[in-house]
Amino acid sequence: MSFRDLRNFTEMMRALGYPRHISMENFRTPNFGLVSEVLLWLVKRYEPQTDIPPDVDTEQDRVFFIKAIAQFMATKAHIKLNTKKLYQADGYAVKELLKITSVLYNAMKTKGMEGSEIVEEDVNKFKFDLGSKIADLKAARQLASEITSKGASLYDLLGMEVELREMRTEAIARPLEINETEKVMRIAIKEILTQVQKTKDLLNNVASDEANLEAKIEKRKLELERNRKRLETLQSVRPCFMDEYEKTEEELQKQYDTYLEKFQNLTYLEQQLEDHHRMEQERFEEAKNTLCLIQNKLKEEEKRLLKSGSNDDSDIDIQEDDESDSELEERRLPKPQTAMEMLMQGRPGKRIVGTMQGGDSDDNEDSEESEIDMEDDDDEDDDLEDESISLSPTKPNRRVRKSEPLDESDNDF
């Protein structure tokens, strides 16, 4: 139910001239009395001669009233109503009532009944009179047809009255014969007795049929009871294959438990394998990064040593001729040791293994003192670090090459 439908319904009923005021609050709760009154008024407005009982006291009367209204509107006005919603007599019944009121309201609008209230009352009275005259016309036509048929039959009977009068007079004047009367009475009694006998035979047949049916019913009951007992017996007996079935079921349960355990173990091992691979990959990445870091530091140290070596060469040219190569080595050896010690500060807890060889074979003891060992917990880190440190022998070669011009300069002096 919508507010617009309820408002339109109240306005249409007011325009049609419904004597009672309909409020919008009347259909908040079921109000079958108001709905029945409105339906009866609308039906009378559509057909004044309609005879529909207005009794709605009991449930059966209300159902009959709703069905009669719906049947009348379907046959006369071709309006299909929902009896269930009408019987609810609440807001949903307003939509069904709108179907009737909208037809009457549109008819009133087409006939120019949109004037004032006084004009509406006059037109309504005229409409009521016109409806009653139409009903009187129908009744007059029916009475005229009945009068015609009855007059024709009366004329025929009056034409036969002369002959019938003579026959009636003769029958009255003729004396009654007792023998013939008794004969007719006996014949009638005999016919009645035969009919009574036939009726008794039918009753006996009915009794026999009843006995036969009772016997069949009893037989069916016995069969049913016997089948029920047989069913109970079959249900109580344990089948022969149940032992094998239970044994197979236990085996299947064990197999399933084993499968479930193995599946869980397999899943766990796969997870452990994935974790191991991930850890190995992380260690490999860490070793790779460490190697790159060591290489970068070694390159920086090499550049620094080359730069410091060039400065030392310029100082050696200015020194005196009696300065020996051993003194030069003693000056240069502390520098790479200091660089390697700086490199080891970035990697605490590890030992670097490597050699820093000089240009001359006589300085083996000094070169052995400059070796720094590096040891790691993992073999891969040791190999990578050994490979990185193997690059270090190139440094003293360059220093040796730089020291050759010094010998030539000594010879010049």
UniProtKB/Swiss-Prot annotation:
GO terms for biological process: axoneme assembly; cilium assembly; floor plate formation; heart looping; intraciliary anterograde transport; neural tube closure; smoothened signaling pathway. Belongs to the CLUAP1 family. Expressed in testis, thyroid and trachea and to a lower extent in spinal cord and adrenal gland. Highly expressed in colon cancer and osteosarcoma cell lines. It is found in: Cell projection, Cilium; Nucleus. Residues 198-291 form a coiled coil. Associated with a number of cancers such as colon and bone cancer. Possibly involved in polycystic kidney diseases. Interacts with CLU/clusterin. Interacts with UBXN10; the interaction is direct. The keyword Nucleus applies. It comes from Homo sapiens (Human). Required for cilia biogenesis. Appears to function within the multiple intraflagellar transport complex B (IFT-B). Key regulator of hedgehog signaling. GO terms for cellular component: actin cytoskeleton; centrosome; ciliary base; ciliary tip; cilium; intracellular membrane-bounded organelle; intraciliary transport particle A; intraciliary transport particle B. The keyword S-adenosyl-L-methionine does not apply. Residues 312-328, 360-388 have a biased composition (Acidic residues). It comes from the Eukaryota. This is Clusterin-associated protein 1. The modification Phosphoserine is found at residues 314, 324, 326, 409. It holds the Pfam family Cluap1. Keywords: Cell projection, Cilium, Cilium biogenesis/degradation, Coiled coil, Nucleus, Phosphoprotein. Residues 305-413 are annotated as: Disordered. InterPro entries: Clusterin-associated_protein-1.
